[in-house]
Design a protein with these regions (language model features):
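Beta1/beta-strand and adjacent pyrophosphate-binding region of the FAD-binding site
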Residues: 1-13
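Glycine-rich FAD pyrophosphate-binding loop
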Residues: 19-41
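Hydrophobic anchor at the start of a short beta-strand
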Residues: 5, 26-28, 140
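Conserved FAD-binding catalytic core of PHBH/FMO-like flavoproteins
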Residues: 147-222
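Conserved acidic residues
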Residues: 4, 138, 255
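Conserved N-terminal helical subregion
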Residues: 52, 56-59, 65, 70-153, ...
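FAD/FMN-dependent oxidoreductases across multiple families
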Residues: 118, 210-256
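Conserved N-terminal glycine-rich FAD pyrophosphate-binding loop of Rossmann-like flavoproteins
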Residues: 34-57
Length: 256
């Protein structure tokens, strides 16, 4: 398969890149190991700056308009941020990513649901090998996140020091409190509550890699929910590592 650009990763970054390139008349193939829709661990808040950059209206995807955000710090102090226009709008990442993905497919981007196994470069461009296809392109974009397969395949960078987080959902009907968008900083790092139409997205995670700092556990998330929402009914708990060495990488190729 020959194309102008291959994009690895069909999340928002990959979809945005595909949108810009299709508008410029370039042929694009997006590769992702997951098919869509797929679950994505994420609180799901979009800032006004982000929304302004999107090529579509998110009204149909918006779950909640957060005109108030509360920050609670380890010293006990709290800070309220109020914005009548909305500090951020809440979406469900599975729905948002699926919508954006379909948006660029309708624009003419092609999609291959496959796992990338090898990336190489020669005088004519870049060759990408998946578990069932070989693609040749002029340029390659790695848009596959903090735990990037692209970065791993084209560098010697190792993910030695990931930070960890747990995410879950609390149905609004089970919460004894009506809570705004909230960040709570604690000994583990930070926790969050992001309101949606019928549930709260809640989570707890490390802010930075620190060997002396314990990793969050499921019970830490449950304790947070009990304290902030007075509820112990926590559903759809997922844990995920986030690579932290991306800043150490600088591309050595002008094509990738």
């Amino acid at each position: 398969i020959k194309t102008d650009i291959v994009i690895i990763g069909a999340g928002p970054a990959g979809s945005m890149a595909a949108n810009v390139l299709r508008d410029a008349g370039k042929s694009v193939v997006i590769i992702d190991k997951s098919n869509f829709p797929r679950h994505k661990s994420c609180a799901g808040g979009l800032t006004p700056k982000t929304i302004a950059e999107l090529p579509f209206d998110i009204k149909a995807l918006s779950q909640h308009n957060s005109d108030k955000m509360l920050f609670k710090f380890t010293n006990g102090k709290t800070v309220d941020l109020n914005n009548e226009l909305g500090a951020c709008k809440m979406v469900i990442r599975e729905e948002f990513d699926h919508y954006f993905f379909n948006f660029v497919i309708k624009k003419g981007a092609d999609f291959i649901n496959s796992k990338v196994e090898k990336i190489s470069e020669d005088d004519e461009g870049v060759v990408v090998q998946t578990n069932n296809e070989t693609l040749r392109c002029k340029y390659l974009i790695g848009a596959d996140g903090a735990n990037s397969t692209t970065r791993r395949l084209i560098t010697n960078l190792k993910y030695k020091n990931p930070v960890f987080a747990f995410e879950g959902l609390v149905k609004r009907e089970n919460s004894k409190k009506d809570v705004p968008t909230k960040f709570v900083f604690n000994k583990l790092g930070y926790s969050w509550i992001f309101p949606k139409q019928d549930h709260y997205n809640v989570g707890i995670g490390n802010l930075i890699f620190d060997p002396s700092c314990p990793k969050p556990r499921k019970n830490d998330l449950l304790d947070f929910v009990r304290e902030e929402l007075e509820c112990d009914q926590l559903e759809h708990i997922t844990g995920f590592p986030i690579g932290t060495e991306g800043k150490c990488y600088e591309p050595s190729s002008k094509r990738m």
